Amino acid sequence: MAKAPVNNAARRVSKKVRKNIADGVAHVHASFNNTIITITDRQGNALSWASSGGQGFKGSRKSTPFAAQVAAEVAGRAAQEQGIKNLDVKIKGPGPGRESSVRALASLGIRIASISDVTPVPHNGCRPQKRRRI
């Protein structure tokens, strides 16, 4: 049975509401292949996010510090529009975009209250992958 056509005029696209949140948390996930920056409020609700790949960098250029800097600037500007002024930064992963993303957030005028490394370290859990031979 065919469904009745949906009237597009009946659908409403709500305008993005500007929240006024002063404090937040910047989660920087820096892997060897990409860097993802997510800015949340204190409860963990995402306000903005950006990644190196989402900014047009492809392949090995995604994993550069410059790509991480561009992604951090995009996420930071979107968070500033939501009212963010102070950030706690949590960095996870060993990638090359760790430091440059924090510098980019600071250069936007956002006050960095603390920087913490939350990279998960096993207490001798799972067996690691085989060693790379290049």
Swiss-Prot record:
GO terms for cellular component: ribonucleoprotein complex; ribosome. Belongs to the universal ribosomal protein uS11 family. NCBIfam families: PRK05309.1 (NF003698), uS11_bact (TIGR03632). It comes from the Bacteria. Pfam families: Ribosomal_S11. The gene is rpsK. This is Small ribosomal subunit protein uS11. Part of the 30S ribosomal subunit. Interacts with proteins S7 and S18. Binds to IF-3. PANTHER family: 40S RIBOSOMAL PROTEIN S14/30S RIBOSOMAL PROTEIN S11. GO terms for molecular function: rRNA binding; structural constituent of ribosome. Located on the platform of the 30S subunit, it bridges several disparate RNA helices of the 16S rRNA. Forms part of the Shine-Dalgarno cleft in the 70S ribosome. It comes from Leptothrix cholodnii (strain ATCC 51168 / LMG 8142 / SP-6). GO terms for biological process: translation. Keywords: Ribonucleoprotein, Ribosomal protein, RNA-binding, rRNA-binding.
